[in-house]
Amino acid sequence: MKKNRLNLNGVVVINKAKDVSSNKVLQQLKYLFNAQKAGHTGTLDPMATGVLPICFGRATKIAQYLLDADKEYIATIRLGIETDSGDAEGEIIAKSPNIPELSAEYLETVLAKFRGDVVQIPPMYSALKYNGQPLYKLAREGKTVEVKSRNIKIYELELLEFDIDSLKIRVKCSKGTYIRSLAIDIGKTLGCGGHLIALQRTQSGPFKLSEAFRLEQLKDLSFEQKIASITNIESVFIDKPIYSLLEEEKDDLYKRGLFADKPHLDGTVRIYDDEKFVAIAEFDKGKLINKKFFDQDILISE
C-alpha cells in the first residue's frame, strides 16, 4: 500500500469519457485522490460515456445500492447493420437494405412494445457468467451458449430524434437492463436489424450528469477542492424516507441491534438520531431485515 494514503469516505460522481474502461477511471481517481480504498458501482462499456459514481472508503459498503438503482441513458441505434457484440465495437455479421420508412408515429408504435415489464436476453458480450466463465470471454473464443432471459422494467422510453437509418432514444430502466440488447430487439422489430453506436448514461440512482466531474476537471483542482467534490454517503439515499429514532429506541438499536416492528415502514429508510443521519435500514412490511451504520460527518477519517 502506498504510504500516507488517505482514508476518504463518500462518493465522487464521474462523467466517464469515451474509450476509457470503468476500471481505468477507478484507478486514476484512486491515484488522483491518493485514496486507500475505492470501488465503482457497475461498469460502463468503454464506448459509453456519462455517469459513473465512484465510492471511497466506507461508501464502498453501499455500492450495491447504486448497482441496484434505476438508470437513465441516451442511446443512438444504427439500423440495417448487425454486429456480434450489439454495438459499434463488434464485427459486422449482417446487413439489410430493407430499412422501413421511418416516421415518429411508426417508431412510437415500435417503442411502445418495449415499455413496462420486459423479458430481455442479455448479449453474449457481457460480464455475466456461464459455468464460472464471463460470457464475453466465451464470445471472443467464438463460442455461443444459451443465455437465460431476465425480467426488467423500462419505465420511460422516449424517441428524441431519427433519420433514415438511425434513431436516438432516452431510456429510464431498472437494474440489469442491457441497452445493447434493447437496440438489437428494436432492430429486429423493425425487420432490418440494428446495433448501438452511442450510449450516454445520464443518471445512476440519484446522481445526474449535471453534477458529474470529468477526470480532467478534477486534475486541475486543489486538494481542498477535490475534497469538496466528494459527496457524503447519505446522498446515495437522498430520495429515501427518514425515520427519527425515539429516545427509548436508541439503546436497542446501537447496543443490541434490535428494532421494534414498524408496520408503516417498508423498503429502504434513512435512520436519523437527533437530526443526524446514522444508518440505513431495510424493512419488509415493518420488520427490520438489514441495517448499516455510517459516521458520515467527516470525509477524512482517522
From Swiss-Prot:
InterPro entries reported for this sequence: PsdUridine_synth_cat_dom_sf, PsdUridine_synth_N, tRNA_psdUridine_synth_TruB, TruB_C
GO molecular function, one term: tRNA pseudouridine(55) synthase activity
Active site: D45 (nucleophile)
Catalytic activity: uridine(55) in tRNA = pseudouridine(55) in tRNA
GO biological process entries: mRNA pseudouridine synthesis; tRNA pseudouridine synthesis
Enzyme Commission (EC) number: 5.4.99.25
Keywords in alphabetical order: Isomerase, tRNA processing
SUPFAM superfamilies per record: Pseudouridine synthase
Top EC category: isomerase
Described function: Responsible for synthesis of pseudouridine from uracil-55 in the psi GC loop of transfer RNAs.
Name of the featured protein: tRNA pseudouridine synthase B
Gene source species: Francisella tularensis subsp. novicida (strain U112)
